[in-house]
Amino acid sequence: KANRCAHYLLERGVHPGDKVGILMMNCLEWLPIYFGILKTGALAVPLNFRYASDEIDYCLNLADISVLFFGPEFIGRLEAISDKIIAHRLLIYVGEGHEPTFSENYVMSAMNYSSENLNIEISDDDYGAIYFSSGTTGFPKAILHKHGALMHSCACEQNHHGQKKDDVFLCIPPLYHTGAKMHWFGSLISGGKAVLLRGTKPETILKAVSEEKCTIVWLLVPWAQDILVALEKGDVNIKDYHLDQWRLMHIGAQPVPKKLIEDWKKYFPHHDYDTNYGLSESIGPG
């Protein structure tokens, strides 16, 4: 799928060094598109799905984005600025149904392209991605990363959490963020499976871990707290799920109360636990 995306982008005039934006919710197409962009030598530019129309317009111009992949959730926000953003820019719709008039349909366009690998040479010193950080004030700040940094994040994460081929990573946070993607990179480099989950309710998370046989789960503090509250109230029962294979729970992106981890260990004493800290500027978690 990534190769088809890359061939499609080359056919549509994308060249090494171009910037290609991704404005999509977590979905099966997200990662093939991301790697398809990288395979062309262009820079992938993930955008925060919470951005309002003016922030989207700002980021498109700041990063000099010439192509934008977007999902159905963003049609309204893009329509509001379509007159400003369609000039000299290709917009590609990724989703079901008919595409908006200002875009072309990705699935219909890319499905017949070759799945063969491209012969485009890319080095660690080539730029590979631009990520946006919220900063402390004003509009988002752009951060430029090389392919070597992306590769380093794979090795760093795998060394940190010890992913192996038989591990299954449950990815809940948004893929536009360096945290979610770089945690997933540990699975990528080890050949392990990843499961994308839309939903943060305790029963939804536990069901996914059980049915998909997940071994590693990255949670945020509110999600972990909700699971503990649901267990304490009896709203969910551990015995209803197959969780023996779940070996690691880690949390990041915010301070983690000591009591939360102590309470977690009461219900999941066999879990390894890790508190993550990372920055978009340093290409994700450490």
What are these model-derived regions, one by one?
Residues 5-51, 174:
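Conserved AMP-binding/adenylate-forming
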